[in-house]
């Protein structure tokens, strides 16, 4: 059923989603949902529906837990080069060690050509070439002491480099293997 009648009006579910999420690129929370979807699809671990209050964003078939963070916004501060950072404050208890931490974290950044492109940004958001990501183990991230934000500089200090989203699965598998080898 895609139409419902309420208050004497015929409402369309698709129209609501178009209105609410028409530009997924405006807010990190919206782009975060898309990032979760893309990562889950790439890793073949999408649950039937998204659970907002689940302990972890995604759980792979082998039980590996993932936390997904995404941003489209570069921060600009006087005297600094533009940089990306991700808000992890809602996971601060996890990062402080007060509750189990996700096995791996995937930090994604998306950049969409704005005025130069005739392709709508919502369509660009589904194009893998517009995404890069960092993959880091939860334990390595916990040692960094971040409880509010994680920046690119933090990830690089931890020895993590960005990769195209298309290479994420390969990098995650290598990280998982090196974790098993320790």
What does each of the following model-derived ranges do?
Residues 1-65, 69-182:
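Nucleic-acid endonuclease domains
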């Amino acid at each position: 059923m895609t139409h419902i009648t309420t208050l004497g009006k015929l409402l369309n579910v698709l129209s609501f989603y178009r209105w609410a999420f028409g530009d997924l690129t405006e807010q990190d929370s919206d782009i975060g949902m898309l990032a979760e979807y893309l990562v889950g699809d790439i890793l073949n671990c999408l649950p039937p529906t998204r659970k907002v209050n689940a302990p972890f964003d995604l759980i792979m078939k082998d039980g590996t837990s993932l936390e997904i963070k995404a941003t489209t916004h570069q921060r600009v501060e006087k005297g600094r080069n533009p940089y990306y950072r991700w808000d992890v404050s809602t996971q601060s208890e996890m990062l402080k060690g007060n509750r189990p931490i996700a096995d791996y974290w995937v930090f994604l950044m998306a950049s969409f050509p704005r005025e130069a492109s005739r392709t709508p940004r919502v369509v660009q958001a589904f194009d893998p070439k517009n995404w890069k990501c960092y993959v880091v183990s939860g334990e390595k991230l916990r040692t960094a002491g971040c409880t509010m934000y994680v920046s690119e500089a933090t990830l690089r200090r931890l020895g993590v480099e960005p990769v195209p989203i298309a290479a994420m699965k390969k990098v995650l598998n290598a990280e998982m293997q090196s974790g098993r080898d320790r």
